[in-house]
């Protein structure tokens, strides 16, 4: 049973522990119970994730971005198999833009999980378990063990955490590493303990290697470390030395890969975050507009769902009211004096810096905010624990636990009443979820224009046939190019959310152990015109194989088939091979005659 007492650790508690062996024994027993409860949370939720993966992912189509990341892992494993450790090091070191951590660890896990899509997906629940454990450990630096259990449960139940535990994506590994890095930083006792400081530096490096966009959170880490340095002046030289060692280790571990791939990383982060590449990933809002400052808030509410976000908001509000009442007005800013206050301030700065960093970019991304959402939830639990009145404290804690259990149940894939998609319109923010049991793959398939059936049922069987179709297209195209003595340059000339280039790239690596670059025609920036498509078919690569097909089920496709065909005919392409898609549509491979 979780006890909702006051949450902060105090010097008086330490004195009591020292003077009363009986109390110390009870505290130790409760600490062990708390660890057991968190272990139980991890076991139950990981089992739910694995069962969901078996029911909803095994043998089914992969998500768009996920397909590319899976190809990274498969090619890593193939390089290790063919070229040994040096072959693996070369392919990992030379593949820029995307963080290498997850594909590398997944490739190393294949001997245990099996080389393939499902074996890759089984790695993500391990990062989920690490995230829950790190959240518990981080919360223990700020609140009592009972409240840390509540925090671990709430983090485990974040809907976006559940979603990314079931998708081969970089968001969850980055979140687990960042949460663990914050824990090690606070555990360093104001950077006095060199071991913990060094460990935090290593975890920051792993965060950066997990996902390159976490570079945006380096200022947050710096602010948190600065708080630890500035709150007190004792042993300042020792603590600055330890911080320098930690920062040096971060650079030593993450630096070589970042330096080697600096150009591609810079182009990706700056181009897709602030340049022309960001145009397709989010709307432009003037800085002085509500849309500019609320864009990230809306995305965070999508990740948390309204009930959990509302509970956190009420918790912060009630805690603030009691704080004002206790000080008979707004408390004057002062230097934090306790380790708990320092830790809270550090997390607040990390969350605020993360929010502002994402606000500055129009790119809405996928799971960009996830790395600091656990810190936000832990701050919410700390706010509840700080409320001196027992009734609101217990009430808010009970609501948070109930909402967390409800969110886990809604995402379990079994309880349809809770899994039903419910959304409400919030002025200034649009439609926001109350409950939504769908996984990201179900959302993508539905977005492709297909009926996914009941939320608690696996996808229709036709969605098991998309990857085999991609395999057949790759096999025929490769064989035809070999017969003609040509190098295959394949491009998609249709706008289809399910039959995309990343699935063809994945199929080539999965079944044929080779990398095949597959491009696609873009109706931007030059528009849906014959002239634009002609240019794309000759530059930067001279395409010799073009896939054209019936329009996707999505209404108003932004690529017009007749314009693509006109561009292809003008360049000497003719249709040579047809395939029937799982939904009954037909695609043709057009080949350019020499």
Task: Locate each region found by the language model.
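Start-transfer (signal-anchor) and selected internal transmembrane alpha helices
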Residues: 1-53, 140, 241-249, 341-344, ...
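Membrane-interface transmembrane helices that cradle and orient dolichyl/undecaprenyl
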Residues: 15, 19, 140-146, 178-199, ...
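Short helix- or helix-capping micro-motifs
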Residues: 45, 151-159, 183, 204, ...
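Membrane-proximal lumenal/periplasmic loop motifs of glycosylation machinery
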Residues: 54-67, 80-103, 112, 118, ...
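Short acidic/glycine- and proline-prone juxtamembrane loop motifs at membrane-interface regions
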Residues: 121-124, 160-174, 365-366
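Transmembrane-helix motifs of polytopic, lipid-linked glycan transferases
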Residues: 122-143, 180, 320, 324
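Hydrophobic, aromatic-rich transmembrane alpha-helices
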Residues: 226, 248-251, 302-340, 348, ...
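Membrane-lumen/periplasm interface segments of specific transmembrane helices
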Residues: 240-279, 305-310, 355, 359-360, ...
């Amino acid at each position: 049973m979780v006890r909702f007492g006051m949450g902060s650790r105090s010097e008086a508690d330490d004195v009591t522990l020292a003077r009363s062996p009986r109390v110390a024994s009870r505290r130790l027993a409760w600490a062990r119970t708390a660890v057991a409860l968190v272990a139980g949370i991890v076991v139950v939720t990981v089992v739910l994730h694995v069962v969901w993966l078996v029911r909803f992912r095994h043998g089914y189509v992969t998500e768009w971005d996920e397909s590319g990341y899976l190809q990274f892992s498969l090619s890593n494993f193939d390089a290790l198999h063919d070229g040994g450790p040096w072959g693996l090091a070369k392919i990992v070191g030379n593949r820029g833009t995307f963080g290498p951590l997850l594909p590398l660890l997944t490739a190393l896990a294949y001997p245990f999980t099996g080389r393939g899509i499902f074996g890759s997906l089984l790695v993500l629940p391990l990062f989920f378990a690490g995230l829950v454990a790190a959240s518990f450990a981080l919360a223990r630096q700020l609140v009592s063990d009972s409240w840390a259990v509540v925090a671990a449960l709430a983090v485990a139940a974040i809907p976006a955490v559940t979603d990314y535990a079931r998708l081969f994506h970089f968001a969850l590994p980055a979140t687990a590493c960042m949460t663990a890095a914050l824990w090690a930083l606070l555990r360093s006792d104001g950077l006095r303990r060199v071991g913990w400081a060094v460990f935090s530096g290593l975890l920051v490096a792993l965060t950066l290697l997990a996902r390159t966009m976490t570079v945006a959170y380096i200022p947050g880490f710096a602010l948190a470390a600065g708080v630890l340095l500035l709150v007190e002046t004792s042993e300042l030289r020792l603590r600055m030395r330890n911080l320098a060692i930690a920062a040096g280790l971060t650079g030593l571990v993450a630096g070589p890969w970042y330096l080697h791939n600096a150009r591609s990383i810079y182009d990706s982060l700056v181009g897709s975050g602030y340049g022309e590449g960001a145009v397709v990933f989010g709307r432009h809002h003037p800085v002085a507009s509500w849309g500019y400052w609320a864009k990230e808030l809306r995305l965070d509410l999508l990740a948390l769902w309204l009930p959990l976000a509302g509970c956190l908001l009420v918790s912060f509000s009630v805690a603030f009211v009691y704080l004002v009442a206790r000080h008979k007005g707004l408390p004057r800013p002062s230097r934090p004096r306790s380790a708990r206050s320092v830790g809270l301030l550090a997390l607040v700065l990390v969350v605020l810096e993360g929010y502002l960093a994402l606000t500055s970019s129009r790119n809405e991304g996928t799971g960009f905010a996830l790395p600091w959402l656990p810190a936000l939830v832990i701050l919410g639990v700390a706010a509840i624990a700080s409320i001196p009145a027992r009734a609101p404290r217990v009430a808010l804690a009970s609501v948070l636990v109930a909402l967390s259990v409800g969110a886990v149940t809604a995402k379990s894939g079994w309880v349809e009443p809770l899994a039903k998609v419910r959304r409400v319109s919030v002025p200034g923010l649009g439609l926001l979820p109350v409950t939504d049991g769908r996984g990201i793959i179900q959302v993508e398939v539905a977005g492709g224009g297909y009926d996914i059936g009941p939320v608690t049922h696996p996808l229709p069987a036709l969605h098991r046939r998309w990857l085999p179709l991609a395999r057949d297209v790759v096999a025929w195209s490769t064989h035809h190019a070999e017969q003609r003595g040509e190098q295959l340059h394949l491009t998609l000339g249709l706008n289809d959310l399910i039959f995309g280039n990343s699935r063809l790239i994945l199929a080539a690596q999965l079944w044929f152990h080779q990398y095949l670059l597959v491009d696609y025609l873009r109706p931007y920036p030059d528009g849906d015109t014959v002239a634009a498509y002609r240019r794309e078919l000759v530059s930067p690569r001279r395409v010799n194989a073009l896939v054209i097909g019936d329009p996707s089920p999505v209404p108003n496709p932004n690529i017009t088939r007749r314009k693509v065909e006109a561009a292809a005919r003008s360049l000497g392409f003719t249709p040579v091979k047809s395939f029937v898609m799982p939904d009954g549509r037909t695609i043709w491979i057009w080949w350019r005659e020499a």
